[in-house]
């Protein structure tokens, strides 16, 4: 009776595993097998979707029968048969052996107030069952003791019959348990149990009565389960279906049933898997593995504890073990020791059947057919026989080796955006070339060139040229392979799924007819390719040459280096620059900028020349394309593989970031004129040269786009935006839409990386909210620019929001006088943005930032403005009491004065433990309401991201009932409602430490302000700083030097202007005597002026020196003419005009004297100017903060 004790329903119902499958129909996959009937094979297909709850009804009763068979296995009276039948919708399951005890159940009778017997309790009462509480060594398939009850609930009628050797018990249950008729009990010596029932088909989505198809489908499914049970119970018990014995009394027979039709003549390997410790050792598993090339993916049938198990750790364990063995065996089997072979899923040709019992498992999933147990149980206790693994592995490897076959070079290939050469793959295949275009626009150019026809009969055409698109990007294959080295030193290269499925690279493989298992060392091997070479046709920019072409070369070097050695990989080198001289139609063409620079230096002037850049293939017009394709062969350059190339490929495209970082710490060494001449003379490009110049330039450019320069704290994009903003808003600072301003920047600053990226950068430059990257925005945002809630990701569309330049801040932080002294980036031969700014204050340590690039991490936490001002002023002002102390600290590279993290706009706390600072959010506890109110989050933690991180933490959510966010963009108010009696438990589980209290630990209200101070250097490459002081110390000399340069330049300009104005005043005084109007031409007048000692001057340079250096001013300003005098108009000779010039000279002289004083001041020239500009910046920042950076 104890086995049928009635339990508490509430506790029972809490178990998720007790609930049945879904009532709606779903696709039941994998339910197909075959069986032998009079020596014929018959298929059992499933034609339609079925209701899991209905299948569960049948399954629960079948599992009950197999559980009973296992329970009686060691008893005197065993179960010798299980009879399952299904006819006209009526399901029946009968087994012999001890029946259900026929005795009155006192507890149930008392509750029901009538006589209730144990069979009724077992089949009709949800609060009782033998499987509710199971021991750890239990191998029953039943889970919660409710399976039979659920079957009764979903049945129109059911008949329960059981005999215990003394009595026979028959009871009718109707109307889904609504009517339980009194049982009929009669004397009997029989021992058996039978369940018959008719499910409520109509309510489960079936016809009533069942249609022929439904009857056939359900019969097939039940028969399969009967066959599975036959394999599970073994030979001692016979399983009948519709009175015919099932012939699958072993795991081998069950495996044959599933695979004979789909994979005849396949090899079947069987084994017994034993465990080394109880209770697992008492129940070995039977395994059969069917290996066949017919199978295209791993499949399994698993009957554990009588349940048809669709998933489980036992399958994972077996699959992993097989995979390891196959990989090892495959490596040992390949004869060619240098062959690079790829392996896909090593289990894709296996169908595995597992039958047996596993103690102590749990059943999960909606249908309770997913086995759950710790995977280490199998690793620790179970061992698979080596003979089984060896024989099966050999079969699998044989199939894998057979699948490595040569590709048919003459077959048609179906690849997107591919046009086949007419002779490709034929007798003249080696005369064909595949043109690999960077993108669609390049394809268009190639098509134009290849279809010139009669106008270029000797040029390339589709007869011998095919073309394919690279799609604008190529995957880095070097990072998508795993090299496996065997004990014998053999290397096997395994491509991952991403690389295997990459359409672009697989398209190239198919089009060329490449074989991953061929080296192409011999001409015979290369002759089997569909083309004689591949020609990369990419843009002449960094993305095209440095990235896409580099990745294509790396792909061939990785798998087929011999093809590069034998000249198979080439490139189309198109003109980068064309110079059109006035009056001439044939331009001078240059393929490298170094060639153009060398040529330009030899020219006296480029005034009569038009210089046009062609970085994109699409820039060439039809006429230029025709001209190029007339000399097509001369533009095709072959790559060569030199000794150093292998290492460089590994550095730039491999997975070892430390090697790449060391290489990228230095800038690119440009090609010399000699190198370019050598390349043109032989039309060959060493791979190492391409990698050291083009690929390295691309990598460094990528770094500069992602990591800021330490001098200005800006990436290249932000620098372009600032330079564009200064230029765009110079005359009128009216607001402009973000997308309009983005178009201006792209046009005037030559931004080539897409509108979306540029607009995002503009929006970020104007964002100003607690936690935003920029504490000092260079633009004023008008509209919704994002909030703290989503970390700025909720900004409005660039079409609807506008920006203005934060001119008051920009003018003081970036003085206009500096702009003439900075080095500039030249794009397409035109001046764009500065290579770097050197602001009045070290902006690099004044703002937040985080970004990875090429193995480096860049993370900065803004420092306190007051500390920065104090340090810079102490450096500049010799009268500052800390001046000498700071210079001592800089000299000896030590830290003395504080440089703390900024707490501006942050209401939390900053604390230092050891070498790191930590930021802490704040909270208030209301014990009465059982609520914790978070009033501030750690620095730079967006609200939504924070709440999501808490919700994902299961050990925290066990204490939390609800999280409600009432935060605004400026303030934090997050209510964390706790479950009853949780506060004390939180204090116990989340310990209080010196660094954080229990609530801070529990709510994750602390983050570490750990920094990665990696910045771009002024001349390219990366510099790694250890402290913020080092950044400041490195920046100070650059800013200091700028003042000296500025003053020296101003001094030179003032002197030249004074000379010019003095000469003009002298001429006005002597004009009557000179009387130049009497001379016939300018040449004669100039001679007279020269004889009278007037200096020839370059008036244009003196009036508008702009970007001229001091050296240029001193050299060219005095090498001019007398236009500054001869162009004077009559009114400029009047006494009033002369008086104004004399006053102007006096002012310039006074300023010159002041500049000379500033050049002589200590501690360095321009120190007082720097102090004044620091004061101006401070005032602008205070005003900006007080006005939310609106400045009004």
From Swiss-Prot:
Its main location: host cell. Keywords: ATP-binding, DNA-binding, Early protein, Host cytoplasm, Isomerase, Magnesium, Metal-binding, Nucleotide-binding, Topoisomerase. It is an enzyme of class 5 (isomerase). It holds the Pfam family TOPRIM_C. Residues 707-1174 form the Topo IIA-type catalytic domain. The active site is at 800 (o-(5'-phospho-dna)-tyrosine intermediate). Gene3D superfamilies: 3.30.1360.40, 3.30.1490.30, 3.30.230.10, 3.40.50.670, Histidine kinase-like ATPase, C-terminal domain, Topoisomerase II, domain 5, Topoisomerase, domain 3. Induction: Expressed in the early phase of the viral replicative cycle. Mg(2+) 2 binds at residues 539, 541. The record marks 799 as: Transition state stabilizer. PROSITE patterns: TOPO_IIA, TOPOISOMERASE_II. Signal peptide: none annotated. InterPro entries: DNA_Topoisomerase_II, HATPase_C_sf, Ribosomal_Su5_D2-typ_SF, Ribsml_uS5_D2-typ_fold_subgr, Topo_IIA, Topo_IIA-like_dom_sf, Topo_IIA_A/C_ab, Topo_IIA_A_a_sf. GO terms for molecular function: ATP binding; DNA binding; DNA topoisomerase type II (double strand cut, ATP-hydrolyzing) activity; metal ion binding. Its EC number is 5.6.2.2. One of its GO terms (cellular component) is host cell cytoplasm. It is found in: Host cytoplasm. Binds two Mg(2+) per subunit. The magnesium ions form salt bridges with both the protein and the DNA. Can also accept other divalent metal cations, such as Mn(2+) or Ca(2+). One of its GO terms (biological process) is sister chromatid segregation. Mg(2+) 1 binds at residues 438, 539. It catalyses: ATP-dependent breakage, passage and rejoining of double-stranded DNA. ATP binds at residues 64, 95, 142-149. It comes from the Viruses. Belongs to the type II topoisomerase family. Type II topoisomerase. Processively relaxes supercoiled DNA. Displays DNA-supercoiling activity only when associated with the viral histone-like protein. This is DNA topoisomerase 2. It comes from African swine fever virus (isolate Tick/South Africa/Pretoriuskop Pr4/1996).
